[in-house]
Amino acid sequence: KNERIFRLQFEKPLTIVLEEPEVHLHPKLQSAIADILLDAYKSFNFHFIVETHSEYLIRKTQVLVAQMGFESNVESVEKSPFVTYYIPENSKPYSLGYRKDGKFMESFGTGFYDEASNLAFELL
């Protein structure tokens, strides 16, 4: 009954802005944020704008897209609920888009996904 009342109050999408929700969280919990956001989106039609530097959170969105068969840039019921923008230094933001396998259609600039690999190679 409470859920029904809650849903009635939010018939229109509610947009919530989260700034670095991963701060001070263990990597496993950082990735779980994506599950929570997807559940809130599907259950209550909540929309989120999330500013993050968490590779774990972003990678989890890719996993969810692959598991659920979502895809960007298609007009269908299975359109991805996630939209990821990369904001390069001294340049304009751009959407990465998701393929059905969860991989991005565009690439991140240097210094994000490649940073951990670069540091590992320095140890060799």
Task: Set out the residue ranges of the language-model regions.
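Conserved helicase/translocase motor-coupling segment
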Residues: 122-124
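Switch/communication elements of ASCE P-loop NTPase nucleotide-binding domains
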Residues: 1-120
